[in-house]
């Protein structure tokens, strides 16, 4: 080990921080419970007395390694990239704001279980402590982190479901500027893979799990995170998140592949003007169209800031993201940030396949990732994403379906037992 860092002993350079004395005292107390040890490859091995202490150290170590990536990820997911990158990022921010707002995230935080709130509190404290002790680090826009912000970014894959919303079409709808019709571009076929091998096929009689991260080398942080409350996990965390996305603990390992199956749906809505607003046909009723004002703040070339305001629309199925030769298109995807964050963290403490499945079945908040799993009891498995809506198979959901027909609605979620899976295969591998 070439470097040992005790967070409690970090120089407290608080001259430039706006933190209050009670905050500084709290951060010092949290830091005193954390040890970060760097091995010969620079990988952080974090230990905390409690799980929140470990999260405090985990995110502090990530910030040491690459604070700009952490900030960039939260600017993206909070819909605030234009505050750093300027007017060109307005449409990316508007896309994010279709699903989130500060007030909604604060309400989600308030309804979160106490244990999760404590983790989010520690996450924010760790980042703010880092900024307080590193006055030479200059954030582009996020100078302070709040606990509720963690709920904006709960899924660790390369691109979230929301990126299925086309920015050019979103811009055309909300700026009332038509765009030329374009052919769907052809993309080279790509793979996303992992391998789990049962003990009967291995030389040492233990399960094997191959994790292919299929990302650029520095897309995620590599860490070990432990606590006296039983957390003991090693693997890859997407920058800014306080859970190991792909990795293993003392008993089980998991990795994710992305297939894009059952992820999102689009609904073609028949919209009419009603007075000063709009309604959309649903069965025999024209329901009032929901709307929400959104204001995007953006950085100008001279360093000052401007704003641009929009009125966004939504049905009970989701926000309106484009029009298609008349009908407005509502976009439906998983929107369960509290449950998604709980599932992402708690599965890192699963001891075997049964406990991993219990967590997945409890929350059903993994929409875009298949899972390959292996444990030290010799169990291996392939698991489909757990957020799969029940759909009427008379309709082709590969295309926008008729949103005015109630039969096209989602009708709850499938039980795990109804989803594709391969558990303890006779072949001995998946």
Task: Please state what every model-predicted region is.
Residues 1-4:
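Positively charged n-region of N-terminal signal peptides that target proteins for export
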Residues 238-303, 344-347:
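Compact, glycine/acidic-enriched structural inserts
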Residues 21-220, 228-231, 235-243, 315:
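Substrate-recognition/specificity elements adjacent to catalytic centers across diverse enzyme folds
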Residues 7-15:
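Bacterial N-terminal signal peptides
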């Amino acid at each position: 080990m070439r470097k040992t860092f005790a967070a409690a002993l970090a120089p407290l350079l608080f001259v430039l921080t706006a933190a209050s004395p009670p905050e500084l005292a709290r951060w010092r107390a949290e830091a005193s419970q954390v040890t970060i040890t760097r091995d010969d490859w620079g990988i952080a091995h974090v230990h905390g007395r409690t799980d929140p202490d470990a999260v405090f150290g985990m995110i502090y170590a990530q910030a040491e390694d690459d604070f700009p990536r952490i900030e960039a990820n939260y600017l993206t997911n909070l819909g605030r990239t234009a505050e750093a990158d300027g007017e060109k990022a307005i449409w990316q921010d508007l896309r994010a704001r279709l699903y989130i707002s500060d007030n909604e995230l604060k309400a989600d935080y308030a309804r979160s279980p106490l244990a999760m709130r404590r983790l989010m509190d520690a996450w924010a404290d760790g980042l703010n402590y880092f900024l307080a002790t590193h006055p030479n680090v200059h954030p582009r826009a996020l100078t302070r982190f709040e606990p509720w912000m963690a709920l904006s970014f709960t899924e660790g894959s390369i691109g979230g479901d929301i990126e299925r919303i086309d920015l050019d079409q979103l811009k055309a709808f909300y700026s009332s500027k038509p765009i030329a019709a374009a052919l769907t571009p052809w993309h080279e076929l790509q793979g996303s893979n992992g391998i789990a091998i049962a003990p009967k096929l291995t030389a040492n009689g233990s399960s094997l799990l191959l994790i292919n991260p299929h990302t650029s080398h520095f897309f995620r942080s590599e860490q070990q995170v432990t606590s006296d409350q039983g957390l003991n996990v090693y693997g890859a965390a997407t920058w800014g998140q306080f859970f190991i996305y792909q990795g293993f603990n003392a008993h089980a390992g998991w990795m994710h592949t992305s297939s894009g199956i059952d992820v999102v749906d689009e609904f073609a809505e028949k919209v009419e003007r009603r007075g000063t607003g709009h309604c959309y046909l649903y069965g025999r009723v024209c329901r009032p169209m929901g709307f929400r004002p959104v204001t995007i703040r953006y950085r100008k070339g001279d360093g000052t800031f401007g704003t641009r305001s929009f009125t966004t629309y939504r049905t009970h199925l989701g926000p309106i993201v484009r029009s298609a030769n008349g009908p407005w298109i509502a976009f439906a995807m998983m929107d369960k940030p509290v449950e998604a964050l709980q599932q992402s963290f708690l599965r890192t403490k699963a001891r075997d396949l049964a406990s991993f499945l219990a967590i997945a079945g409890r929350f059903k908040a993994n929409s875009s990732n298949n899972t390959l799993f292996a444990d030290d009891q010799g169990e291996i498995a392939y698991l489909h994403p757990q957020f799969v809506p029940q759909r009427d198979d008379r309709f082709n959901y590969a295309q926008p379906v008729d949103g005015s027909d109630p039969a096209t609605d989602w009708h709850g979620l499938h039980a795990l037992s109804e989803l594709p899976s391969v558990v303890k295969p006779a072949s001995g591998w998946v």
